[in-house]
Amino acid sequence: RACEAAGAAFRVFGGRLLFEPEAIVTSDGKPYRVFTPFWKACLAAGAPRTPLPQPKRLRFAEAKSDRLEVLKLLPTRPDWAQGLRDTWQPGEARALARLGTFIKDRLANYADNRSRVDIDATSRLSPHLHFGEISPNQIWHAVAHAMSANARAVRGAESYLRELGWREFSYHLLHHFPNMPAEPLRPEFVDLPWRDDQAALAAWQRGETGYPIVDAAMRELWHTGFMPNRARMIVASFLVKHLLIPWQRGADWFLDTLVDADLANNSASWQWVAGCGTDAAPYFRIFNPVLQGTKFDPNGDYVRRW
């Protein structure tokens, strides 16, 4: 409206999602609250638009800028960011290279290995997605092309695209339920008698719970800003269902420490683990940290590393 009043044209070019929230709704115009029918509706809507080619020329206005180091936002000792620099190389070129490596080396076995925490089996594109260094459309079409070119990659590709679907679902939920980061989507969980145990919360944050797989994951998070998705589910279940600490405290910690910290994904995932989301794991489903470690870190390599 402000643009119209000023006589300026205003157009929106969505690029953060595969499908805009207004485009994927039920037959009566309501948001989907269960993932499977939501994803079926997305697939029925057709393939996302093909990414546009890189422009041959861009015109930028000249602007003066200082380097981030000038702001002195981080202490020099200890160098808290060293682990991030050792683990991540930001930028579009690195994102595209990581996508290519994933498709070449890991996509075919993704469905079988994606939950392993002891091997590098996933794309690790989430930070690049979060910061807009690569678009979900680029990933979709690259994976779809690999699926059509290699029959061995079909199962892994379908599994991977489904994970992109969960990202879409999280964004759609946040769009329709903007209080999701703070309030359970199932109102019966509002008055759950959580524990206010600051010592237990601190032990979880520092990786000092005494459970090897939990502690390893929390230490990896602190040093690198990342942990595998399976590890996220394990530590989240431990905080919420073993320590009985509110899921919002865990979500806050993840937002502070994850390099791919994303409000939609983070909120929906924590509500899923806690059992208070729209399409969540049952409240009585508890991840056994010992059995999870045995299954997804069978030789203890992940625990020994961290």
Segment roles from a protein language model:
Residues 2-6, 95-97, 240, 275:
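A generic short-segment signal for beta-strand/edge and adjacent turn/coil regions
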Residues 3, 7-11, 33-35, 56-70, ...:
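Short secondary-structure transition/capping segments
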